[in-house]
Design a protein with these regions (language model features):
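Structural signal for membrane-spanning alpha-helices in multi-pass inner-membrane proteins
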Residues: 20-27, 92-96, 171, 175, ...
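Membrane-interface loop-to-helix entry segments
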Residues: 5-36, 106-108, 113-149, 162-222, ...
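A generic transmembrane alpha-helix motif of multi-pass inner-membrane proteins
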Residues: 2-24, 246, 443-530
Length: 530
């Protein structure tokens, strides 16, 4: 792109950053420093506002950049992410949303510790939540780096690295200054921008093919170089048994992982009642479902109009398919329309990244302060002290996310999110479901469920082709690959459930049935909910 084109895109980036910083400053004027205000925004948001914020939190760089890129490169197999991300919300709606809102205050650990020995359970759940959040943050950082590399013509590695650092700095500012209230409004603004941008691009793609989806798919298949195989399963997850098991593993992780994501669970605490939480999820499903239907058109549109080779040439993982599609739909690289549309889409993608990293950072810093700090500190911490720790933790989490984001910069963002979902489904979902629905569940079972899912998931990722043993690995020059699957969910998710069951049946501690009855009534009726 020319210097003028880069300037326009950077101006739009800067405008969004200025708006979000203004929102953060405005929201932080009247803050009182209470934990409820910092973690939950005072529980003052309406179901519609929270539904938009949930969708803004969930529709990440993985959705806008990564999924469309995978569809553009691998056709049918890329659709697994679309189906998995959407179907996952049925699990959230029917099993989690209302019960979590009634039983907890700020974090996942609040729900689990309601009927257990608090200290070991909070430490385990807090550790797991921070781990999942950092993995999810890494994907957003990689998306930011890919976006700016494209904007600057892919020639400046330093600019790409500084972008990752800049995103990390901004997310710390958003969280430490504005807490949940600022984060929520940033996510609402971003959701509106993202839906508007996706609708505009989808309409332009359909107009290009005269509204004929069949023609769009045929053109994508012809341009892909794979013919009809592009529209059939197996291009990415086909062939041998390893690829097929990887397909199943990823599907399990995507469908079950959403219900264990800390930054999604924390959104249910920002509304006043469980009924409002359920209605928030209904709003979110409508928005998210509409968005993922559009990613189908955008992914195949990028394959048909831009071509997989051009997408892969810009970014090997496919993370730049949507901006390239916008450039072409607007008239090409040398046209004013192409430049403007590219800049708008790039700014929306950047807004997507900033909004999501703010929500994830807030959830992880809340886990550090509310779960780990208060548990490791023998004396009960004051709310203001806890909030101070959360703000400090945001800085540390930002540094870790930046470092890992620089390391993983060449991986696909949707793939990285798939790993985060696998860890969430392995470590957080078993303990959450057991706590809510199993009367005989014990403290040992809770701790074993978390670590029995978390440790194998991380270990299997380290021993997988993601880290070593192939040209696409993080460390292609070494080989300590002993686990053949790229996503550990198929093995680690059952292990999490098994460990929770085994820890409970071997525990000498009798289950507290009175506390379970109290929790059950509270979760179903809302009696005594905060």
């Amino acid at each position: 792109m020319s210097g003028n084109h880069q300037t326009l895109a950077l101006l739009l980036f800067s405008a969004f950053v200025a708006v979000t910083l203004a929102i953060t400053t405005w929201v932080s004027r009247n803050r009182h420093g209470s934990a409820e205000e910092f973690y939950a925004g005072g529980r003052l948001f309406s179901p519609m506002e929270n539904g938009f914020a949930i969708s803004g939190d969930y529709m990440s760089a993985a959705s806008f950049l990564g999924v469309t890129g995978l569809i553009a490169l691998f056709g049918y197999d890329g659709l697994l992410y679309v189906v998995g991300f959407l179907v996952a919300w049925l699990v959230v709606l029917f099993l989690v949303a209302e019960l979590v809102r009634n039983c907890g205050r700020f974090t996942l650990a609040d729900v689990v510790a309601a009927r257990m020995s608090e200290r070991p359970v909070r430490i385990a759940a807090g550790t797991s939540s921070v781990t999942v959040s950092v993995l999810y943050l890494v994907a957003q950082m990689v998306g930011a780096g890919s976006l700016v590399a494209l904007l600057l013509g892919g020639t400046s590695e330093a600019a790409r690295n500084w972008t990752v650092i800049g995103v990390g700095a901004l997310m710390v500012i958003y969280v430490s200054m504005g807490g949940m209230r600022a984060t929520t409004w940033i996510q609402i603004v971003k959701a509106v921008m993202l839906m508007g941008g996706a609708i505009a691009l989808t309409v332009l793609v359909l107009v290009r093919f005269h509204g004929d989806l069949n023609q769009l798919l045929r053109s994508a298949a012809a341009r892909s170089g794979h013919g009809d195989a592009f529209l059939a399963p197996g291009l990415k997850y086909g062939g041998d048994w390893t690829a097929r098991f990887d397909f199943i593993s990823l599907g399990l992780a995507l469908v079950l992982g959403t219900a264990g994501l800390p930054h999604i669970l924390s959104r249910f605490y920002t509304v006043p009642t469980a009924r409002a939480a359920r209605r928030s999820v209904v709003w979110a499903i409508g928005l998210i479902g509409s968005f993922y239907l559009m990613t189908f058109v955008l992914g195949f549109g990028a394959a048909a109009i831009v071509g997989p080779e051009a997408v892969r040439g810009s970014n090997a993982a496919g993370n730049t398919a949507v901006p390239l599609l916008a450039l072409d739909l607007g008239g090409g690289a040398d046209s004013t329309g192409g430049t403007v549309l590219f800049a708008i889409v790039a700014a929306i993608a950047f807004a997507t990244i900033l909004a999501v990293v703010a929500g994830i950072t807030l959830a992880s810093s809340a886990s550090v302060a509310h779960d780990l700090y208060t548990s490791l500190r023998r004396r009960r911490a004051k709310p203001r002290s806890e909030v101070t720790v959360a703000r400090t933790a945001a800085v540390g989490i930002g540094v870790v996310a930046i470092a890992l984001g620089l390391l993983a910069r060449d991986l696909n963002v949707a793939f990285l999110v798939g790993l985060a979902f696998a860890v969430a489904a392995s470590a957080n979902l078993p303990v959450l479901l057991y706590s809510l629905f199993w009367r005989g569940f014990t403290t040992r079972g809770a701790v074993w469920a978390v670590y029995g899912g978390l440790v194998p998931a991380l270990l299997l990722v380290l021993l997988s082709p993601v880290v070593s043993g192939s040209p696409e690995s993080l460390f292609p020059g070494v080989n300590f690959q002993y686990f053949p699957l790229q996503n550990p969910g198929l093995v680690s998710i059952p292990l999490g459930f098994l460990a929770g069951w085994l820890g409970t049946v071997t525990s000498a501690e009798p289950p507290d049935e009175a506390k379970h009855a109290e929790t059950e009534v509270r979760s179903l009726t809302g009696a005594g909910a905060v």
